[in-house]
C-alpha cells in the first residue's frame, strides 16, 4: 500500500495566494516519483512548481534524487519555490 503523499508545510498558503491572484491550481503531490507539487494555470500559461519549505535550512530544501531525475528528463520548465512571494514571482515573471 502506498503511503500518503508528503505535502510541504507552506503548500496551503501558497495555493491560497495563487488562487487569490486568479491562478488555477492542481496539487500533484499524490503522483510522487519526483513529480512537482503543483500544476498552475495562469494567464493562458501552465507552470510546474516544486515547493520547498522556506522555513527549513537550505540543506533540507534540496531536491530529492527522484526530483532531480524527474526534472532532468522533463522537457518543460519546472520552478522550485519556497515562499508565497517566490511562487507569485515564478508565474508573473516566467523564465
Residue locations for each model-derived region?
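Catalytic phosphate/metal-binding cores of nucleic-acid and nucleotide-processing enzymes, i.e., regions
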Residues: 1-95
